[in-house]
Structure formats: C-alpha cells, structure tokens
C-alpha cells in the first residue's frame, strides 16, 4: 500500500464542505409532504442539480429521482478518489468496494426473487470498481449459478468464495450463505495489509464496529429465516464484540444482544440508537436502527481523529443515508403511503 503523498487535510476540508450540503431534518419534513415531481424540483435546487438536468428529458417522477440519486452518489464518491492521494486514496478505494459487494448481492437477490433485470439495475450503485460491462453481464445471468460463474471468470475477489458457498445455498434454499460469503470477502480485503498507526487506529476501530454490527444483523436474519443453519458458521472475523459462540446465543435473544452492546465500548456513544434498536418491531426496523447506530458511532470517531480516513468514511455513510432516505420518501409517496408510514421507511 502506498504511504507517500497522502493529503488528509485537503480531503477532509472538501468532505466537510460536502457534508454541510446534506439534507437536514427540516428538509426531510418538507420532502415527506411533496409529490415525486415536487421532490425532483427541490433536488434540482441542491447538489443534485447536475443529475436532474441531465436526466430530466428522459425520465420523470420516481424514475428520475432514482437515476439522479444513483448517479449523484457515484459522482460524489468518484470525487473522493479524485481528491485523494497516496495511502488515503488506497484506503478510500478499498472501502468503496462495498458497492461492488452491494451490487453482487442485489443481482443475486433479483435472480432469486425473479425480479426483472431492468428493476434490479435501478438498485445498482455504480460507485465501486466493477465496470459497467461486468455489471451488465451479471444482470444478464439467467441463474444464480451463472452469475457466480461470471464473477469467477471475471477474476473478482467474490467468485471463489461464492462458489464455495453455493452448495450451502442450494441445500438450504435461503440466500444467507451467499450473502455472507460476499460480506466476509469484502471485510477480509479491507483488513488485509491494513497497517494500524495514529492515522488509521480509529479507522480500524470503526471497521471492528461495522463487522460487529454486520454479525448482529446476520445472526438475527438467520434466526428469522427459520433455516437450519448455525449462526456461528457465518461469523465474520475482525470484530471485537462477539465470539462466534456468543453470536449464536444472541441470535435467539435480542435483549441479550442489546445489553451486550450497552456494556461494550459502544454503549456510551450509542445510548439513543440502542433505544431505537430495543423498540424495533421488525427485522427491517432492527437493521435500520443498527445502521443508524453505526453512522452515529462513525461521527464520534471522525471528531476524535479528524485528519484521517475516518471523516471520509463518516461522510460516505451519511451520503448513503441521504440517498436511501430520499428514495424511501419518493417510493412511499408513489405507493400512496401516509406521511407517518413514509417516516417509518427512512432513517
């Protein structure tokens, strides 16, 4: 990994400026009361202007919003790589591979559910390292097995792990073995050759938290699925909060899991977020609450060591949340949901 020419001061200053332009609670309250056309007009008056103007002649309503959100997200993250040099560039590029992982899981889920490829394409985020050609090839796959074969043939880091997990998927009939293989591969490459020093110690701590929360999500997803699968077998190495055995136990008792987090190093920073987790009455709400907790935690780390990669990662998470929220509001409005129902759909 390159260690010379890193420029955290410059990148952090640019990121802070971008962060200040993110939508706040007042703007979300406005969006909830708007039609999709009104949401698009408001977006045109903000950082999404370029995308709305470029796409406005071809799309309208929710389609326009969806495409503008995804293109803006990719542009914002391309800017991060354009600004960064040396070691900082390497760290950001590795983290942004999360969108390759997202796209692999999105394609697999789409094939599994029989969703039209055009609809699956709408949910892809082209902000990682996968080329458009590779993503289009995956969208054309006629089966999950074929998609896995294409990932292997393209030499991606996910191919061999997915091939190893395919038999477990075939036997269980649930996607968890495949999704877990993607997550494990992603985090393995993130942690590989990561030299921990003053500039990266907080980043390593954040990655531990992200892995801890991913393990918690996976454990509860397994418990909800009813599949005869041991959660310990799908434990992701690299966290600090759970052992594989403890995770298998917590999968059966959410209160014990929450209490374990409260008593951990995360407890003081996440008291409010943990209250949200405690009151979540569905798996989706539970996962959203965990995502909120992770974002809240990343914010605290960014202030501890501002001249590192951590503020950049915190911005990436915040930008993702903004895009997810605007998308949820637009889709909810199109589906005829009430204001209160829409508010439950975003973070």
From Swiss-Prot:
It is a peripheral membrane protein. It comes from the Archaea. It is found in: Cell membrane. GO terms for cellular component: plasma membrane; proton-transporting V-type ATPase, V0 domain. The keyword Cytoplasm does not apply. Keywords: ATP synthesis, Cell membrane, Hydrogen ion transport, Ion transport, Membrane, Transport. GO terms for biological process: proton motive force-driven plasma membrane ATP synthesis. InterPro entries: ATPase_csu/dsu_sf, ATPase_V0-cplx_csu, ATPase_V0-cplx_csu/dsu, V-ATPase_V0D/AC39_subunit, V-type_ATPase_csu/dsu, V-type_ATPase_csu/dsu_dom_3. The keyword Secreted does not apply. One of its GO terms (molecular function) is ATP binding. Component of the A-type ATP synthase that produces ATP from ADP in the presence of a proton gradient across the membrane. HAMAP family: ATP_synth_C_arch. This is A-type ATP synthase subunit C. The lineage of its organism: Archaea, Methanobacteriati, Methanobacteriota, Stenosarchaea group, Halobacteria. The gene is atpC.
